[in-house]
Amino acid sequence: MDKYISKTPLSCYFEELVDTFISVVNSINKVDESKHHEVELILFKPPIITLTNLYNMATTTESYIEFTMLPVDKPNTKFRNRIPLSKIHGLDVKNNQLVESLDGFIWEEKSLLLKKDISDNSSAIIKYSIEEKTLFVDYKRRNASIKLELVSVVRAKLRNIVIDFKMKYFLGSGAQSANSSSLLCALNHPKNKPSLYIEFEIMMQDKNISKKKLLEELNMSASALFLSHPKYIRLCPSINPILRTHLLKKQDIININTDDLYITSKTDGIFSHVYIEKKSIFCYFSHLGYIKEYTASREIEETIYLYAEMRKEESILYLTVIKVLKPCMEDRLSELAFVKNHLTGIHDRLVFVTKCYDGPFESSSDLVVSIEEMLKTEQEGIILFYSKGEDSTTDYKVKKDNTIDQCVNVIYRYMSSEPIVFNDKGSFLEYKRYSNDKGFPKEFSTGKLDLNGSVEYINNIYCIEIKHLNPCTGITNLVLPIKFIAEFSHNDELIQPRIDKTMKYLYESGYYGNQLSVIMDHLNDQKLRIGDVFEEEKLADIAAHMKLKDSMRLNPDGNYFLSNRVRGALGILSNFVKTLLISLYCSKTYLDNHSKRKVLAIDFGNGADLEKYFYGEIALMVATDPDDNAIETGKKRYNERNAGDKSKYYKFNYIKETIRSETYVSSIRQVLYFEKFSLVDWQFAIHYSFHPKHYSTIMTNLQELTESGCKVLITTMDGDYLDTLKEKKKFIIRKLLPETENYLSIEKIDDDKVLVYNPSSMSKPMAEYIVRRDTLIRVFREYKFKLIDSCNFKTIIDRNISFINGVSRLESRGSTKNFFELNRKALEECNDTDVLELLSHYMVYVFSKEV
């Protein structure tokens, strides 16, 4: 923090702005009414509280689509135009349609004449520009060079200055016509975040105005925005918490080391950094996002740096000291005496206090009893800390309500410009909640905000206003964009917006609240009470809930496949068959309603087929697998493919579950609720589950999760062929590999199982159940699934050889051309191998659920 307090205060920015304005005015000999001279200070990534304060004093609020083109022959110049949102009906409007809706050829030409960086703040600049009208006749022909943005503006026009708070959503280029390039997509997806700016512009209406009057007006308005005179404000980036506080799971309490361990109450305040030097007290309050300076009543001899928690009561700020960072102390208990001796009475509005604590404890039992007693009287929970040693740098918390932070995105619909929903009880907003899945937003659930006295939707700037906030923060109401971070209770109640976390979400990449794994830990911990930690049955219930119930797994848990395996002809041609199968049954031949394309992928593995379903244009996929590593790889693949703005993949959830489990349906219902699937993908995996002891569970799960007409895609080995094996059978599949690696072996080990091993891709053999055709058909028929398609892989390859070797050579699209080239090489590699024979023993089965 000390490196930021040495920076110039905000008042110096205004002095530099006024000096620039006076210099510009003196350089203008004659005023041309057709030109607008603009001198402005722009603050990037402003504190979000300034939006609220400016809205309270605003004279204008509006939104519009801004079109910007940078002419190649005119450096430092841009052409601009705009369409008010009031002239656009509905939000499902593509970029090229917006360009077509522009009227006339008169645009605004803005030329940048001066750009001055603030010396010690890269997020602040001063600009001098000239704006004038210009003709831009062929803009429709050059729409690919036009950038589109949705701009929402909150404006306060004073006597000599104009203050704008702008929120800009990037829409893409004017030539784009994809669904991902539309107003609807920009508003509905949390990855499309607005860029925020605050601009202070001095108007040219009075060239003879004095520097003193301009500074008075700027400082007065800034005092209202920043809640203090600008000379006491220092802008800075977000300062991270010094001390991390981790959730202590209740089942872990009995195992924690009690040496030098103490407990104290947890309060709901604002984390703050306090730096005291001589008579200056610098406070960084995390919800404000900048540093405020106060003057101490006496001079402090040594520099003091504190990490504290602020609560406001009436006009007094109570700062509960959590950690003294300067001077360095070995024992945190000695910090309490230091605060009392050095910081008492140093300011009439800043009161430094410490907490009472309990400890140390002789045993875990004493600790549990103390925690249980303290929780009876505490509103929030308790904090555990070590007074000294390496562990003293981390605090632990046990909360009454394990709250979580998640990203909220209000839901907009196609034909409506507003998200408000009406019912017999009033009006409300629907929103989606997103958790942070390793830097990507993962949809968690939905909710609604009742539009009552506490919440209002501000329709013309795509914001909401939340009132009656916790008074201890010093903020009673808050205006936020329709994308923000909120705190939720364990029972899904939206408690309050998180101002500091919202700024982190808006201004940093890859943050959407708590990680999904953290959220699940919090929710599972909520199911235990403190007193349950000594009851083995209660702990076992929680452990059983968290651990996959799959005691009858065919192969023991472990890694069976090599990480550096290279796919040969067998894998490539099998992939060709799967591609055709998925393309066919995702196509409109079978599913002509886009809303029905919901896929359940059973034992989905590492997600190799994700892209096939993207081109199948499905709406969503829920995948399940019992293996953590497979799920990790599958999620990573999905996130990589869904990373770009142009690549809007279908909604994807990956759950650790097995179709053999009685909890399978309830696990799926956590992400899909009451909808049913229209397509089930069970490729090269049914042979790990299809056994008489699992028939009832498997088929009941399938029946409950699928709608009428649902297609179940199954690929597996021909069980009737496997039944005939008398000894181990080897198929040569890679002639270029040594004899120890070039084969795939199948050995029947009993009446219902075979052992499969491919040394070039597997570290050890895997057992598979024998899936006999008649048995498969009979079991599926008992649960109202009818076989509609069946064929072996070789037949499909034979039917397509002429096309692969012939017409497909005319393909010019890069990925398609490479796909067929790969299959042509695979067919060539089949010579002198048993690949085609082996493919004749691989089967496709397609079942359809009867009405």
From Swiss-Prot:
Residues 1-544 are annotated as: Triphosphatase-guanylyltransferase. MRNA binds at residues 574-575. Its main location: virion. Its cofactor is Mg(2+). It is found in: Virion. In the N-terminal section; belongs to the dsDNA virus mRNA guanylyltransferase family. In the C-terminal section; belongs to the class I-like SAM-binding methyltransferase superfamily. mRNA cap 0 methyltransferase family. This is mRNA-capping enzyme catalytic subunit. It comes from Fowlpox virus (strain NVSL) (FPV).
